[in-house]
Amino acid sequence: MKVIFTQDVRGRGKRGQVKEVPDGYAQNYLIKRGLAKVATKGNMNTLKRVEANEKAAYEAEKAEAEKIKAELEKDDTIVNFKSKAGTDSRLFGSISSKKIVEGLEKQYGIKVDKRKLNLPEPIKTLGYTNVHAKLFKGVEATIRVHVTEQD
């Protein structure tokens, strides 16, 4: 019997895959537990529509990430912060990924999730710092952060 897997089944198939399986296994296990559906014409058309929608959503998300990357990598896109500092250029406090994301949104209107930033530890010195951001699978950008001393 041909079935369409609705979930991953270890050793049998992945979600969205169409496979031939024994009738008893399909009826008594896969279909009963909601792991698969019978591969009828209607179900096949639904599967194609769902795959097309998922692909379109993936492409839209990737295009949005590319757009954000292009905006971040412009020469004039530098996130500026003013902070109090000591004599050795060390900040009183620090600039975290949360503050960087807030600064990006406030200064340029760019929204980025703070979890996408690769900042091992907060910025604690004055000057320029490059912060890498993984915006999407295969789309990475560099955010330039400039910390100056507050008067």
Swiss-Prot record:
Matches recorded under InterPro entries: Ribosomal_bL9 (IPR000244), Ribosomal_bL9/RNase_H1_N (IPR009027), Ribosomal_bL9_bac/chp (IPR020594), Ribosomal_bL9_C (IPR020069), Ribosomal_bL9_C_sf (IPR036791), Ribosomal_bL9_N (IPR020070), Ribosomal_bL9_N_sf (IPR036935)
Keyword tags: Ribonucleoprotein, Ribosomal protein, RNA-binding, rRNA-binding
Database matches in SUPFAM superfamilies: L9 N-domain-like (SSF55658), Ribosomal protein L9 C-domain (SSF55653)
Gene Ontology, cellular component aspect: ribonucleoprotein complex; ribosome
Molecular function terms, GO-annotated: rRNA binding; structural constituent of ribosome
GO terms for biological process, alphabetical: translation
Domain of life: Bacteria
PANTHER family associated with the record: 50S RIBOSOMAL PROTEIN L9
Family: Belongs to the bacterial ribosomal protein bL9 family.
Function: Binds to the 23S rRNA.
Name recorded for this polypeptide: Large ribosomal subunit protein bL9
